[in-house]
Amino acid sequence: MTEARANRLSETGIRLAREDAALEITVAELAANALTFSPLGWARISIPSMAQAPSVIALRLFARTVHAIGGREMPPRQDRVQAALDQVLSGEKTKLTIGGTIVTRQQEWLSVWREAGKTYPSNLEQPGKWDGRFDVLVEPFWPEGTEVRFMGYEGLRQMETMGDRILPDSTAPRAVLAALPGLWNENKLVAGPCIQTKSPGVDGICLKAHFHPPRPITPC
C-alpha cells in the first residue's frame, strides 16, 4: 500500500467516525424527547417524535431500545428492525415481536418490553447478570436452595398475596412485571425485585435488580 493510499484511507476513517459521532448525538437528542424509560426494563416511545425524525435516526433509537430490552447478546437484523418499525409507525400492526421483545402501539405511543416465556435465561444461584438485562444480588444473604428466575404471573400472584408490590412504576403492564426477576425456592416466591426502593420479601430478603444491558439505549 502506498503512503498516499494509506493517508486517504485514514482520512476516510476519520470522516466516517465523525459522521457516526454526529448521528449518535442526534439519536441521544431524539431519545431525550421521545423516549420514556422505566427501571423495570421497559420503554415508551413517542410516535409523532419518531415520525418527524430522520428515518436513520428513528431506526437507530428503535433498534437500540429493542436490543437493550430484549436482553440478547446480538441485536436483531437491521432489515427486521426496519420492517417492524415501518409496520407499527404506519399502523399496519399494533402488536408484534422482535428480538425477544413485544412492541405494541397504543394511541401515540409505542411500548417495548421483554417477551417472557419465549426463551428462558439460565437460573441464577449467585449474584450476577440475569437475562442479559439485570444485575442482581440478594441482601442481606442469599438463602440456600433459592434461585433467580422469571417472576411470571404466578410470582405476581404470590407477591400480591404477601401484600407486596413492585415499585416504582405503577403504570407498567402486568406483562412487564411478569418478565422481571424473582427469587424462588422451588415453587414458592421468596422475594420480588427491589428496584430503586426496598421492598423486602420473606424474612426481610431483598432481591436487588438494576437494569444494565450490555449496550445502553442512549448512546451518550
Provide a role label for each language-model segment.
Residues 2-220:
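AMP-forming adenylation/ATP pyrophosphatase catalytic core
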